[in-house]
UniProtKB/Swiss-Prot annotation:
Assigned protein family: Belongs to the NifW family.
Keyword flag Disulfide bond: no
Subunit structure comment from the entry: Homotrimer; associates with NifD.
Coiled-coil region: none
GN (gene name): nifW
Name used for this protein in its record: Nitrogenase-stabilizing/protective protein NifW
Amino acid sequence: MSFADTLRQLSSAEDFFSALHVDYDPQILNVARLHILRKMRLYLEADKGDLADESLQKQQYQHYLAQAYNDFVHSSPIKERLFKVHQEAVKPVKLPMVKLTSLTMPPE
């Protein structure tokens, strides 16, 4: 069976990590599974390398899956904004801190 055929049979994020021999923390994967796979796909699309050799192709997929996973170890799905719902969400506005000493009580 070819590497491409093997990938087509995978049905979960855990399957991809297992097939590509990439270690992961289940807690991180439970939160960001779709985001990680999408980010991996974006990395693969950006790389215009030759994928004729299956061993090189597997190494490339393994590298980009590990890189995408690592992105979400240090970030979050909301910060990465890969999906439309996150891209269109309003970024939270950082409000300036107000010192407690500047607050006054209203007159009675």
